[in-house]
Amino acid sequence: MHTVLGHHSRVAYAEIHDDETAATAIGVLRRAVAWFAARGVTTQRVLSDNGSCYRSHAWRDACTELGIKPKRTRPYRPQTNGKIERFHRTLADGWAFQRLYSSESARRKALPAWLHGYNHHRPHTAIGKTPPISRLTNLAGQYN
């Protein structure tokens, strides 16, 4: 699972992959940047853990190409990345282990709907009990 979380909004983007290679992480980053851009969010920085994919030259080069400043958390300090760690717990409780799925395929297929509910409907206590998407003020047609 590769997850991206907006620092201000807490809007979440996630993809399920069977590996954590630099190529996969870079692909997720590119798609996440495009996904956030379509919602009016410009990605300036990315905070990641110290996995080998995020320490690679390819990751650094991709960030440079996208105009993003990469930063890594301090080793053995998950608190540094507390927002995403908390999101992972919410993801596990609300999607991964919420119910018994008939198969891994069924569980994977349920992720987009869960993410939509999380982003658009689920109140988030850290942002005034509003859904994360409400923090994005540049959405096309929002004020029409």
Predicted regions, residues:
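Acidic/histidine-rich, metal-coordinating catalytic segments
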Residues: 20, 38-56, 76, 130-133
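Active-site beta-loop-alpha junctions of metal-dependent nucleic acid enzymes
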Residues: 15-39
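Distinct, well-ordered alpha-helical segments
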Residues: 59-60
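Short, acidic, Ser/Thr-enriched surface-loop or helix-capping motifs
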Residues: 6-7
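Short glycine-rich loop/turn motifs
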Residues: 1-3
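RNase H-like polynucleotidyl transferase catalytic core
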Residues: 45-50, 65-83, 100-102
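Short small-residue beta-strand/loop micro-motif enriched in glycine and branched aliphatics
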Residues: 11-15, 71-73, 97
